Amino acid sequence: MQQPIVGVGHSMGGCQIATLSVTSRRIFSTMILLDPAIGPPEMGLATLGLGQLTLRRRTQWLTREDAEKALRTSFSTWDPQVLDLLIKHSIHSDKQSVEMEDGPVSLVTGRYQELVNYIKPSFIRSGKVVGQELVHQTGPVDMYHMLGLVTCSTLYLCGGESTLSTPRARESYGLAE
């Protein structure tokens, strides 16, 4: 691939971009990680919490207006321009004809498609369970332990009110208050 390539990822996408940068060291010249789901075990990112949240999250609305209202409420602390972009690119019409402006809409990424990013089976081909739980996710914790292997310049950005930017989280990264 021709450089420069800048990897940009938010939340679990940030974790995946960072992991790719470690496994394919020359792919990115720079990374921008926005509230990346990367952290030590005590932050709880290796548990089923992300998967459970995904399964409870609403993904369909009767109208685009309903979806926009719900997203603006859920992400009310976001910068308005960023929120406008999220709404523009994350909702699509459920109708066959794109000419119809109103009607049912869904998130572009469905809940089960998102879920497979957060959990993986812990049983082997024989069906025998390897761990205590049937599914688990270690990607965010694995990447936390691999942060020292990142070789490209990286902007690691967490919002002031992000759960990934609490005093406890900053302490786990060795960052001063």
UniProtKB/Swiss-Prot annotation:
InterPro entries: AB_hydrolase_fold. It is found in: Peroxisome. Its EC number is 3.1.1.-. Keywords: Hydrolase, Peroxisome, Virulence. GO terms for cellular component: peroxisome. Its main location: other. GO terms for molecular function: hydrolase activity. Pathway: Mycotoxin biosynthesis. Disruption phenotype: Abolishes the production of ACT-toxin and impairs the formation of lesions on leaves sprayed with conidia. Does not affect growth rate of cultures, sporulation, and spore germination. Induction: Expression is positively regulated by CSN5 during infection. Abhydrolase domain-containing protein; part of the gene clusters that mediate the biosynthesis of the host-selective toxins (HSTs) ACT-toxins responsible for brown spot of tangerine disease by the tangerine pathotype which affects tangerines and mandarins. ACT-toxins consist of three moieties, 9,10-epoxy-8-hydroxy-9-methyl-decatrienoic acid (EDA), valine and a polyketide. ACT-toxin I is toxic to both citrus and pear; toxin II the 5''-deoxy derivative of ACT-toxin I, is highly toxic to pear and slightly toxic to citrus. Gene clusters encoding host-selective toxins (HSTs) are localized on conditionally dispensable chromosomes (CDCs), also called supernumerary chromosomes, where they are present in multiple copies. The CDCs are not essential for saprophytic growth but controls host-selective pathogenicity. Although conventional disruption of ACTT2 could not be accomplished due to the high number of the copies identified in the genome, the high sequence identity among these copies of ACTT2 is likely an advantage for RNA silencing, because it allows knockdown of all copies of this gene simultaneously. Belongs to the AB hydrolase superfamily. AKT2 hydrolase family. This is Abhydrolase domain-containing protein ACTT2-3. It comes from Alternaria alternata (Alternaria rot fungus).
